Amino acid sequence: MSILARPAAPSPRPNALANWLLLVAVLVFAIVVVGGITRLTESGLSITEWKPVRGIVPPLNQAEWLAEFENYKRIPQYAAFNLHMTLEGFKAIYFWEYMHRLLARGIGAVLAGVMIVAWWKRAIPAGYGWRMIGIFALGGLQGAIGWWMVYSGLSVRTEVSHIRLATHLIAALLIFSALVWTVLDLRRLARDPDARPARPTALAIAAVLILAVQIMLGAFVAGLRAGYAFATWPKMGDEWFPAGGWNVAQGLANLHENPIVVQFVHRWWAWAAAIAALAVARAARKRGAVGPVHAVATLIVVQIALGIATLLTGVDIAVAVAHQAVAVLLLAALLWAGHGLDKPKVS
């Protein structure tokens, strides 16, 4: 039979499909990391147009670079902060935004390719086709959210909306989570052809939501530059909460608009996220899991240390990027631990 021939009957290959989707998940992890670098280097507004196809090709000569630079000069961010910027400086920030968009296109192409080949080879197990279509649709929506975020910084603001930034990050992690959970389901199916997809327990759902809130708060911290408000730990300056830090006029909007309050909540909500993740790890251990338990525990320690280091270094870019990267790895470990909670306990 030709390698291009379509099988006459379904030929599910859950392990092979899991490997390919794991690759896509790794690419999503990479784009989240690059997105963090893009934000921290103030590169996100360097490309002021949305060209899904033509935008694949970067400027190739001096005239094209100058045209792109002129586009950037028209937005408020340039006038407010970058009047001194040279063309070489512009190329540096353009690089990260371009790589971020190129990775996004690459992820879409790889996922589409995997879906098409798996469909043609009839290798998608029953019940997984619509799930993969849903993940691909989320990817398309994420592209629109990305442009919606960038657009917020092109006319009046000198930076993107931190609310839209958080939406963009959470959408990326929703895609990442769907991929990781699907990979785990497919691995289970490969071990046992009669296995059903795992059902997330209330504990696992609660822990993931608590961690998602903490990651969202981290996006608020980045978007509001709240990490620069206080570079001390555990106190904020000389106080646990600075006098006058809560703006009475803002009311509950302090929780997402006030840099001091956002940093404070992000500091202490971290402990709720850690406790919830450890509760899942403990439950997983009772069901015989070892790898995910160690992964969750180790990553919690590393993540807390990186969070403190991010503050104490005055938001050093390398440390802050590592902090964001480990947040995604912790989410993956939490999903791994939570995936097996529908199994009976080991006596």
UniProtKB/Swiss-Prot annotation:
The keyword Transferase does not apply. Keywords: Cell membrane, Heme biosynthesis, Iron, Membrane, Metal-binding, Oxidoreductase, Transmembrane, Transmembrane helix. Heme binds at H266, H323. GO terms for molecular function: metal ion binding; oxidoreductase activity, acting on NAD(P)H, heme protein as acceptor. Its main location: membrane. Pfam families: COX15-CtaA. It is found in: Cell membrane. Its cofactor is heme b. The chain crosses the membrane at residues 17-37, 106-126, 132-152, 165-185, 202-222, 260-280, 295-315, 317-337. Pathway: Porphyrin-containing compound metabolism; heme A biosynthesis; heme A from heme O: step 1/1. One of its GO terms (cellular component) is plasma membrane. InterPro entries: COX15/CtaA_fam, HemeA_Synthase_type2. Its EC number is 1.17.99.9. One of its GO terms (biological process) is heme A biosynthetic process. The keyword Calcium does not apply. It catalyses: Fe(II)-heme o + 2 A + H2O = Fe(II)-heme a + 2 AH2. Interacts with CtaB. Belongs to the COX15/CtaA family. Type 2 subfamily. Catalyzes the conversion of heme O to heme A by two successive hydroxylations of the methyl group at C8. The first hydroxylation forms heme I, the second hydroxylation results in an unstable dihydroxymethyl group, which spontaneously dehydrates, resulting in the formyl group of heme A. This is Heme A synthase. It comes from Rhizorhabdus wittichii (strain DSM 6014 / CCUG 31198 / JCM 15750 / NBRC 105917 / EY 4224 / RW1) (Sphingomonas wittichii).
